[in-house]
């Protein structure tokens, strides 16, 4: 069943001939779906709508404002009713459905007597693995050999919300707080993947002891150390990152 679900999702992403995104047909209210059909904006697939929008807006292609707007709407629906819904469901399947919780936030979450690690970006698998690893008795014992009382994990930006809503891990802040977090002088390690990562954090980190680790092959930074995250060796790589 898991394989069938995964292949259906992949087909919704990359379908090139006919059809439409399953989520649009199955989840949208009937009246909403009828309205989409009327205007011809039901997404065919996620990738296809994005590529077509880029083609139409290239120099000398589509010059009709209303026509461009309709494709913009179809692309937006592909993003929301395709990409966002699929990624949300996959994350819930893999890591569990979030529940309302109480948690802390802001820079007060950092602890002077523990190793402060911050996960930052948008890929929940990396954050989940680091969460698992920092709670391993062996890793906690390792931190104590370095003079710390333990490991304190925090989040930044969207990844922060993933581990907050599922595990109660506090968030250090949002997009505009990443450099300020380093300026506290308390962040020992900042591990990042993709999106919303300011390039200046490596320059700021040089003024402190903070290590910045990039993990995605698509997103490297000058001044950061790169440890590529591989889902097939997730725990092993997460341990390596935490031990930095």
What is each of the regions a protein language model found here?
Residues 1-244:
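Metallocofactor- and cofactor-centric catalytic cores in central/energy metabolism, strongly enriched
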């Amino acid at each position: 069943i898991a394989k069938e679900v995964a292949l259906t999702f992949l087909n919704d992403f990359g379908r090139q001939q006919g059809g439409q995104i399953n989520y649009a047909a199955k989840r949208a209210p009937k009246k909403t779906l009828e309205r989409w059909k009327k205007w011809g904006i039901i997404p065919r697939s996620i990738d296809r709508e994005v590529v077509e929008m880029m083609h139409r807006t290239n120099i000398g292609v589509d010059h009709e404002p209303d026509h461009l707007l309709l494709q913009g709407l179809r692309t937006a629906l592909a993003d929301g009713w395709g990409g966002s819904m699929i990624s949300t469901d996959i994350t819930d399947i893999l890591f569990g459905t979030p529940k309302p919780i109480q948690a802390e936030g802001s820079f007060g979450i950092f602890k002077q007597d523990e190793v402060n690690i911050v996960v930052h970006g948008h890929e929940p698998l990396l954050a989940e693995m680091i969460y698992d690893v920092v709670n391993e008795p062996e890793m906690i014992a390792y931190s104590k050999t370095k003079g710390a009382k333990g490991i304190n994990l925090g989040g930044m930006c969207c990844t922060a919300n993933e581990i907050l809503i599922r595990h109660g891990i506090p968030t250090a802040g949002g997009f505009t707080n990443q450099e300020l977090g380093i300026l506290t002088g308390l962040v020992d390690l900042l591990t990042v993947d993709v999106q919303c990562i300011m390039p200046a954090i490596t320059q700021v980190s040089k003024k402190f002891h903070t290590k910045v680790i990039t993990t995605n092959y698509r997103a490297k930074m000058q001044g950061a150390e790169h440890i590529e995250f591989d889902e097939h060796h997730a725990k092993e790589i997460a341990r390596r990152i935490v031990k930095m």
